[in-house]
Amino acid sequence: MYKNEEYLKRTIMEQSRHLFMYGYATKERSEFLQSLEALYPMTNNHSKPVALYFDLFGLPRVETDIKNKDIYMLHTMSREYLSFLIASEILAKTIKSSENNLDDKLARLIKLTNIGRNQNHDKITYTTDLLEKFKISRDFYYENYINYVNGVIGNVSTDDIALPFLNLEMFVSQYKRCMDMKSYFGIVLDKKSQLSSFSVQAVNNFIGARINGDISIKVATEPDDWETYHCANGGLIEGVHDYGTIELDESYRAYAKKLRRPIQY
């Protein structure tokens, strides 16, 4: 167990500030972070924050040369994958919580989502249909990213999916309005594997956005394992919006001590 574990849990979830949580990538860290879902669940009481835990949240690092690839497309696929991943989990947990009259409550959200629907696809009517379409889009971007960077395909067409794009900020804002939710979603991202640099920047874009009243990104990583703190536009996160840091263990102090060592020639 971590020292002051209960204090850490409250500090993480009872403030809407975006956070970087520094700690060794251990089973203990994952179990601690996952326990936040049980403490801050999706319930019919919409006055408290909701924790959503992800240990797989980005597109994988593919060791291949991307200098001839469309960088804008890679950023787009990374952003949309993360957006559909988070939205899918929100809807899945909402359906599982057995809300009454869910289709009626989310009717406005479904209507707004239909505006961005590919017109060659059927209109979305039910929450379960919306979740299915979100999952299809999520998987589409994951698979096509890998195929594109590996040269299996030369272009990515979104004609075959009903929902090619999702504004996550709009989705969560409208979801809260429909459900009369007064708090926010704490998106707990447990970095346990190597990510595409584009996915790292997609996360940074959300942290750099002023959306933490609705979506608060909380990244758990080893101190030297987050590839960059730059957003997709090249600017640093803190140049747009500040974030907090939490030390789960002694890893950050050990990292800082290492940085202070003199260079050995």
What function would you assign to each model-found segment?
Residues Y24-T26, L56-L59, D190-V200, A220-D225, ...:
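An acidic- and aromatic-residue-enriched active-site/binding cleft used to recognize and process polar
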Residues M1-Y2, R17:
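Intrinsically disordered, low-complexity acidic/proline-rich regions
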